[in-house]
Amino acid sequence: MVSNIGIRPAEISSIIRKKIEEYDQEVKIVNIGTVLQVGDGIARIYGLDQVMAGELLEFEDNTVGIALNLESDNVGAVLMGEGLTIQEGSSVKATGKIAQIPVGDSYLGRVVNALARPIDGKGDIDTSESRLIESPAPGIISRRSVYEPMQTGLIAIDSMIPIGRGQRELIIGDRQTGKTAVAVDTILNQKGQDVICVYVAIGQKASSVAQVVNTFEDRSALSYTIVVAETANSSATLQYLAPYTGASLAEYFMYKGRHTLVVYDDLSKQAQAYRQMSLLLRRPPGREAYPGDVFYLHSRLLERAAKLSSQLGEGSMTALPIVETQAGDVSAYIPTNVISITDGQIFLSADLFNAGIRPAINVGISVSRVGSAAQIKAMKQVAGKLKLELAQFAELEAFAQFASDLDKATQNQLARGQRLRELLKQAQSSPLSVEEQVATIYTGINGYLDKLETQQVRKFLTEFRIYLSSNKLEFIEILKSTKTFTDKAETKLKEALHEFTEEFLTSA
């Protein structure tokens, strides 16, 4: 006998209605393509009709690529990894995103790669914000002219080729002339100045990068520094991206009203990586086989350095790009490009380096196009005469090689010049404060070094700076508070010089 089953139509209809409501009818349109060819860090993909230039692509093995060439029948993409397991015929998915990186205060003191992932073994970095790797540079209205000094701690630069906050100053020279040393010294000198530093190593040896990081650690500079490193064994794509990552990390702080300093070491390697990518993508080569848009590669990076207007918080990004020359040839393609983009250049000479003049800065052909506006008054008061005397000395020195008998005035001028040249020499990783620099230059241009033998000059100056900081604090205080070389400060400095010179000459 069949039992009566109570069918409740209301309950059934409510269940059906609930199921209908839960049914997700959303249709996702995913842009998918197929790999035609892969190799040398480049993939050619069929399909992907809706892809954007610069869009991130995801391959089956989770390798990420960037679509760079959008051609009529295929897309050329560069891979941000080895991509060894990508096969012909495998599928590729367009992500709809442009390359971006996480940013934040927690990056300070860390070493990261071009994708802002930590490579220093200190664990993950927690951040909540992100920025596009390629951000537009601030416009004309968003900027103001450079007016604050960015002290490097090197006498030759701070006195004669001064750099301001928001400036772009190129460091150019042959290999092994101390370009990285100048940049690293500048970062060390920012200690206590409330400046965030970003050091970008592009295509360097891993041992060189480790050495720089150790220097920062030893000198307590890592706490305000971020290191972005893509070494020589990294793929061309990552070497090409590294400078933009460094700029994005610095921009985060700049738009928060902070001062930042970015060192790109070096842009020649980035240009070579970009040339490799472009040639493999079959883009037409131009001068020195670089692609036609290699100027834009560097201009869009360096234009992001700026001094922001008061409405945007007066933050700044100072850029120190480094470019390597071959046998001092500044007229090659990349050097001329970067010289024309930047606001001046510091030229390092192999001849001066080999002659023992270090930092090997050729003051004659180095310039700073906006720096004088950023010099403090005290430095301006003493630096003008220094530059003039060194220029006259360089001219006389060339002439003196041919002349046998020189008059007394010329001999004195040559002797003074040699002592001034000694005064500009500085040991690596020993930046000087502005007060010490002003005192040092004043000593040289006012003849206090003329009585000494040339080889005694550096010992005299080192000991004098120690004497000044322990016995004549009033002089340092006047310069710190007024930023001007007042009559009172000059009197104090003269007193110190007379006292110390007597002491030094009697003990020598």
Swiss-Prot record:
Signal peptide: none annotated. Its EC number is 7.1.2.2. Pfam families: ATP-synt_ab, ATP-synt_ab_C, ATP-synt_ab_N. SUPFAM superfamilies: C-terminal domain of alpha and beta subunits of F1 ATP synthase, N-terminal domain of alpha and beta subunits of F1 ATP synthase, P-loop containing nucleoside triphosphate hydrolases. It comes from the Eukaryota. ATP binds at G173, D174, R175, Q176, T177, G178, K179, T180. The record marks S366 as: Required for activity. One of its GO terms (cellular component) is proton-transporting ATP synthase complex. Keywords: ATP synthesis, ATP-binding, CF(1), Chloroplast, Hydrogen ion transport, Ion transport, Membrane, Nucleotide-binding, Plastid, Thylakoid, Translocase, Transport. Belongs to the ATPase alpha/beta chains family. PANTHER family: ATP SYNTHASE SUBUNIT ALPHA, MITOCHONDRIAL. F-type ATPases have 2 components, CF(1) - the catalytic core - and CF(0) - the membrane proton channel. CF(1) has five subunits: alpha(3), beta(3), gamma(1), delta(1), epsilon(1). CF(0) has four main subunits: a, b, b' and c. Produces ATP from ADP in the presence of a proton gradient across the membrane. The alpha chain is a regulatory subunit. This is ATP synthase subunit alpha, chloroplastic. It comes from Chara vulgaris.
